[in-house]
Swiss-Prot record:
The lineage of its organism: Bacteria, Pseudomonadati, Pseudomonadota, Alphaproteobacteria, Hyphomicrobiales. Keywords: 4Fe-4S, Cytoplasm, Iron, Iron-sulfur, Metal-binding, S-adenosyl-L-methionine, Transferase. Residues 4-114 form the MTTase N-terminal domain. One of its GO terms (molecular function) is 4 iron, 4 sulfur cluster binding. This is Ribosomal protein uS12 methylthiotransferase RimO. NCBIfam families: 30S ribosomal protein S12 methylthiotransferase RimO, MiaB/RimO family radical SAM methylthiotransferase. It is an enzyme of class 2 (transferase). Its EC number is 2.8.4.4. CDD domains: Radical_SAM (cd01335).
Amino acid sequence: MVAPRISFVSLGCPKALVDSERIITSLRSEGYEISRQHQGADVVIVNTCGFLDSARKESLANIDEALKENGKVIVTGCLGADPDVIRQTYPNVLAITGPQAYESVIEAVHTAIPPIHDPFLDLVPPQGIRLTPRHYAYLKISEGCSNRCSFCIIPTLRGDLTSRPISDVLREAEKLVQAGVKELLVISQDTSAYGIDLKYLENSWKDRTIKTKFFDLCRELGDMGIWVRMHYVYPYPHVDEVIELMAAKKILPYLDIPFQHASPTVLRHMKRPALMEKTNRRIEKWRKICPDLTLRSTFIVGFPGETNEDFNMLLEWLEDAKIERAGCFKYEEVKGAVANDLGLENIPEDVKENRWHRFMAKQQQISTHLLKKKIGKRLQVLIDESQGKVAKGRSQYDAPEIDGVVHISSRRPLRVGEFVTVKIEQSDAYDLYGIAV
């Protein structure tokens, strides 16, 4: 008998990608086939994003496409937390569930097309099904967030911080390493708050007792002999402890910290930490401890009430801090966000656009200057793409999809997933160019 086929669309952030991997793993264990095409599938699952208006539009467009090409559609994810928005336009979807509603998604699939599975056939590898390339994987350590940033509705969509016990996280990490993963990208909504909700619950691991705590997690992952990269780190004081592990080469000297802005006034309106002078002193301290440290961050321009003075303060902070990687978003009003009700003046779209271009130009200058310093150095690079003797990879300074790459020429064919030493010969605003040695 032919196994039922599920087509799957995963939208949004890496956290949503991990949710998709979990759902697909459950479906495969029950005998469902996963298809890349809507046509011919028994049902389509769309894992949506609902954070920004642009993301909501993309989610609705994907639902529309799935309905036209297939007709049987199950919707899950963040946009599913607001089912009326979906039902008003697409009343014929089979089911709508919110984020993290794994069991509800599986039940909806069972209703649409019951599973057929030979219990003697193992369909899922120990590490589960992954949607990333085989050599790297996202490791989600918690769900939700207990911060209340005024522009964000994540706590409404996904609830307060809920950490996974550290033994569960480490078991998953170990299985991934055993499956050949070379790099773990640690993610959550608030990575450095890991374990606070569990009051740093103690677990047994390898005949030892360890705490469900950010530092302990970094230390244990650092002993697994692979690249470990930290994302979505809120700048709590205890982050300082982890810099020592980076200096000791236990985990990658890379911190993804979403600073969002530099103006104290804007940061207070955002309900974010507003002591950027103190943050600058901490960055200086971090770089003294770990000179190889790379900082990545994201920023928002055009937040309601942002003045020219506020924006210029952001540009000055960029020039002073000289962070290696920075992304910038033009503010979009998010339905349900507190920022909508602050009574602040909205910034015209043309002003937002101008500020975004000025921000990006400033960061390109900084990045160009910093990358030139890599010329002549030899870097360890993990290969992401290969066309024989020409390849692309990433050094410790770059996360997949959001940062730059290293373009490589080689005398021998290079394989995806292998580490190569590369001598850097050129650079531009974002990327490096070199020869495998």
